[in-house]
Amino acid sequence: MNKTLVIIDGNSIINRAFYALPEMSNKEGLKTNAIYGFTNMLLKIIDTYNPTHISVAFDRKAPTFRHIEFKEYKAGRKKMPDELREQFEPLKDLLDKFNIHRLEIDGYEADDIIGTVSKIAEDNGFKVYIVTGDKDAIQLASNKTTTLITKKGVGEVEEYDYDSVIEKYEMTPTQFIDLKGLMGDKSDNIPGVPGIGEKTGIKLIKEFSSIEGIFDNIDSIKGSTKKKLEENKELAIMSKKLATIIRDVPVEFNLEELEYGNYNTKDILDVFKYLGFTSLIPRIGNLDESEEIVNEANVEISKLEDIDEFINKVKENNELIIKTVTREGNILDKRIKYIFLSVDGKKIYYVEEDSIYKLEYIFTSNEIKKLGYNLKDDYISLKPYGIKLENIYFDITIAEYLIDSMSSTSYECSAIAMKYLTKKVKTKEELLGKGVKAKKYQDLDFEELSSHISQIIDTVKSVMPIMEENLKESNMDGLLYHVEMPLVEVLADMEYEGVKVDKEKLNELGSQFKEIIKKLESEIYKISGEEFNINSPKQLGVILFEKLGLPVIKKTKTGYSTNAEVLDKLKDQSPIIDKIIEYRQIVKLNSTYVEGLLSIINPIDGRIHSSFNQTITTTGRISSTEPNLQNIPVKLEMGRNIRKVFISDKGCKLVDADYSQVELRVLAHMSQDETMIDAFKHNEDIHTKTASQVFNVSMDEVTSKQRSDAKAVNFGIVYGKSDFGLSEDLNIPVKQAKEYIENYFNKYNKIKEFMDNIIEDASSNGYVTTILNRRRYIPEIKSSNFMLRNAGKRAAMNAPIQGSAADIIKIAMINVYKKLEENNLKSKLILQVHDELIVEAVDSEIDIVKKIVKDEMENAVCLDVNLDVDLNIGDSWYDTK
């Protein structure tokens, strides 16, 4: 067997990972971004290069011989941040769990250890791969050793072997040492020869081979280069010595100690779970063949022949695990290829399309609990057949979302199976591939498809009791069974129903936008004095800051920043700014909503069938995609015009019901602030009331400006805004914003107490809860980084309020949906956006629909203040506002 060693520069990779990735923390508040980046890279390297041996070298704090010879060596380096320092020991512990060899030796750097170990391995017939972010290691490249230099943080590597170094740099790997001796290295504070850069250095090395060769032939060098070299000969020789990686460090190990693979998978999984690396869990199965990883489900798969017997068995158990596989097609008439069914998760049956109606009883029976993975898809798959999947009881994706709402990558069955069962289930990408070459489920051969589905069904049955126990312990079992699971059916029907779009009006709007864009382009070119690509930040930056001479607010790596924040600060500097802002807004409206909507109108019914997502946001809010209806801009009139294209069908009207200030009402209830509760109970305008409290005037004396400012304060408090954030919103001094907030908390003192208690609870528990016990974990609240800690505090203040508002709208949706069904109405709930529900009501049913919607929304939960609903009717979404 060929022996392959991967040796990693631990300090280099963890440093690069730390600065490449945003801050991450586990539930205990431990920083994990550097560990995550390192581990992700490690798994990728193992998967790519399949090493038989691995070692990781680390620096030690003790000074090296380089520090002794040159006191200024690495003197300019910044002190290591505490957030990075605290990740070293957990990383080393993880490496130990992988049974990966580690080396660190006093007096020597990781580079020297790598140089020595790689030489020993080469001499023993190994193929060697060195992984580092430091180009110094290129000097170690040879016919037996490839140096992998990380790029794009630690996401990719560039390979350097002996031939590729010569091809790219026209010098041998060892001549890299001479080059560094000449040009120095700022990061290590190696001086080199002042005035000699890379270009001149390469030219000299190519001509004279080495620093020694240069000085042996110094008289053949002319001009200032000769002078620089003569004046700095000792510096050049010393710099070369400092840059030379030592390859005879007194290491004590034998190569057998570096063998990779003899590890306990459960130990690694336990550490991954502790660190919160749920997205990495499935990748352990790719590496491991030990008994710890279950690679095959112990199941039987067969075609269902005796349907009556199976129906009786399902009725006896009152549970059915279901997974449908559909052919590609339109949501309204998509055909089912197979349905896989099981009672116990071990004996799995499949049927084809011709048997669907024979099983209708078990699908539609409310007595039989339906269990599965992404049950919304299964519900929608049966809709074209006129079959309604009743009693959607347990979906492992939704259960896992409640258990860990912070991990947006962990809800795939592969991650769930590995996390709870140490079982390998292929990811969607592993099964189907990725990109343009990705297959569809319908294209898989039956053996591969059925094997994968059986793994999913086995996982559903096996993890359900574990998840149920977790949810019970955290008091979220009620949230699952009474809110999230009943909501699946509601969202599925909303997707299937869709919303009617006026295509003619949409095209008309597109024409208007194009005319405005053309006009704005002309005006921008006139002010700037030339034509240029307005959509290019680089070209726009040159126009604004060089040609027009506007003050530079911020720079990026590629030039001037022209983002929205920068443009906002330049508004008073030139008339071109307002036109650029408007241009960008209209271009986005046209591309996202006009062109975007036109491309997804269903040809069968002329409606748009948005996907409603239940497991995306950390707060519990529902989101939507294709299109994202939550983001349709309403502050601009042109943005509001987009709502004109969403219309009611013939013989119908849109009934729009919007909660009035639901988050402030939740705040009043949760804080038990008497002043705010009293204001809502007496139907006082809460923003006017707040203005009178903050500005110490009677409610009759409140001006429109004061009310507007008070509104910003009210919602600023809900979102945990700082005095600085409020000052930016209101365009007032920070001191004044601070006074507003202080006055607010003086008048609403229970709210201040409530917010303080929430922060304290979040700091001690690591999470906050909503009125229905939904948890939002906030690890950043324990960060030693001031800005992140403050962001955590803001999230802690907002999450219970916004999350409770999400709980309320979900309950309202379920109740409205049920009432429409119970009354046998043809009217349908079709949209949910923020705190707003839209029902497409048949003309003859409008009165009863209005009553149902208002009653169910206002009585969704019992609070100490009323839930008020604003209700409007119109032919389009725009008309209801």
Where are these regions (language model features)?
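Function-dense linear segments that define catalytic or interfacial modules
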Residues: 340-345, 405, 411-428, 433-434, ...
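C-terminal polymerase-core module
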Residues: 518-522, 526-578, 746-794, 798, ...
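Conserved RNase H-like, two-metal-ion catalytic cores of nucleic-acid enzymes
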Residues: 5-6, 10, 16-55, 71-72, ...
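Conserved catalytic core of nucleic-acid polymerases
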Residues: 439-442, 496, 602, 609, ...
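Extended two-metal-dependent nuclease catalytic cores across DNA- and RNA-processing enzymes
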Residues: 2, 22-25, 75-248
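Catalytic palm active-site di-aspartate
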Residues: 395, 487-496, 659, 723, ...
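Conserved "right-hand" nucleotidyltransferase catalytic core of DNA-directed polymerases
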Residues: 232-353, 436-632, 653, 663, ...
